[in-house]
């Protein structure tokens, strides 16, 4: 049997995935990176985007937002503030949420409200880009 990478994907609500896979591609703050079995240890902040889990020739994509990735001798762990399977993204609801968030930026009464709304706009735009591909 070929080497496998142990991978854990954890959100605040629950563990979303735990198992052995061939490879995981992660949207790191400095760019996407791939993790294979026996990868050198490191940590990275993750940016909003899709992780791609590759196992036995099949790819599974999950949108993640916020958090970090840690590669150790034991494998890869991603602690994500939010995670949703790309196949489960409701693009119509997402378009409405994005429109509402953009309106909230315009209607914000102070800088804090504007920053919060702008952060939502950025998240929804990233989610929309992932869902489109």
Swiss-Prot record:
This protein's UniProt keywords: ATP synthesis, Cell inner membrane, Cell membrane, CF(1), Hydrogen ion transport, Ion transport, Membrane, Transport
One GO cellular component, as annotated: plasma membrane
Domain of life of the source: Bacteria
Membrane topology value: Peripheral membrane protein
GO molecular function terms listed in the Swiss-Prot or TrEMBL record: ATP binding; proton-transporting ATP synthase activity, rotational mechanism
Localization, UniProt: Cell inner membrane
Gene3D superfamilies membership: F0F1 ATP synthase delta/epsilon subunit, N-terminal (2.60.15.10)
Cell membrane as UniProt keyword: yes
Coiled-coil region: none
One Pfam family, short name: ATP-synt_DE_N
CDD domains, sorted: F1-ATPase_delta
Family, similarity comment: Belongs to the ATPase epsilon chain family.
Role, per record: Produces ATP from ADP in the presence of a proton gradient across the membrane.
Subunit structure: F-type ATPases have 2 components, CF(1) - the catalytic core - and CF(0) - the membrane proton channel. CF(1) has five subunits: alpha(3), beta(3), gamma(1), delta(1), epsilon(1). CF(0) has three main subunits: a, b and c.
PANTHER family registered for this protein in UniProt: ATP SYNTHASE DELTA/EPSILON CHAIN, ATP SYNTHASE EPSILON CHAIN, CHLOROPLASTIC
Name this polypeptide is given: ATP synthase epsilon chain
